Amino acid sequence: MNPEQFQTALAEKGIELSDTQLKQFHDYFEMLVEWNEKMNLTAITDEKEVYLKHFYDSISAAFYVDFTKFDTICDVGAGAGFPSLPIKICFPHLKVSIVDSLKKRMTFLDALAEKLGLTDVHFYHDRAEIFGQNKAHREKYDLVTARAVARMSVLSELCMPLVKKGGSFLVMKAAQAEQELQTAEKAIKLFGGKVEEHFAFSLPVEESERNIYVITKTKETPNKYPRKPGTPNKLPIE
């Protein structure tokens, strides 16, 4: 998917990009490739692949969820900024917080935000388990996103504590998501969530499977969650 195809594909979904936004994506791609030579940000560096598997894939959530109704977003373990920064470029009103445990990624994200002229973006170098117990952030976000490889039960413990009551947790998964969801149902309920919607679709060009789950927070997460760093991964609630 080249930049022109990317622009057309988004327009077909009702997302019209301005010249400024197109340049932001171009600069994002260039910086990602440039910085990737000195630090491991992504295995995907071909332009068409980046536009499809990073940019388009990140924004695909907006085909099913109305981002205009959200104000604050927290992205847990965003790595090189996915999915939250492509979404932010498309919806500039959003106030985005990214938490990641790797300091070098923070350095990249700081430089990227400055280069792209992004405002209302904040980057936090922290473990998600510690961040989720921080009163300044706990149960403060309209939407929390995760596009991570961790199991859904683990992601729920890391992300649900950050979602405000009435807010949403948006999980982006590739294949075999239904099986993961079944295993995670106990955890989702324990942390105050209820699975509201599931959208299954294929990424264009390569036709790979994608799943988006919207989990609504119906009650507060018990204070003891998330547990200490490493525990959710070692002893997932399933």
From Swiss-Prot:
Binding site for S-adenosyl-L-methionine: G77, F82, A128, E129, R147
Gene3D superfamilies: Vaccinia Virus protein VP39
GO MF annotation terms: rRNA (guanine-N7-)-methyltransferase activity
Keyword match Cytoplasm: yes
Pfam families: GidB (PF02527)
The keyword Cytoplasm is annotated on this UniProt entry: yes
InterPro entries hit by this protein: rRNA_ssu_MeTfrase_G (IPR003682), SAM-dependent_MTases_sf (IPR029063)
Protein name: Ribosomal RNA small subunit methyltransferase G
Provenance organism: Listeria monocytogenes serotype 4a (strain HCC23)
Organism ancestry: Bacteria, Bacillati, Bacillota, Bacilli, Bacillales
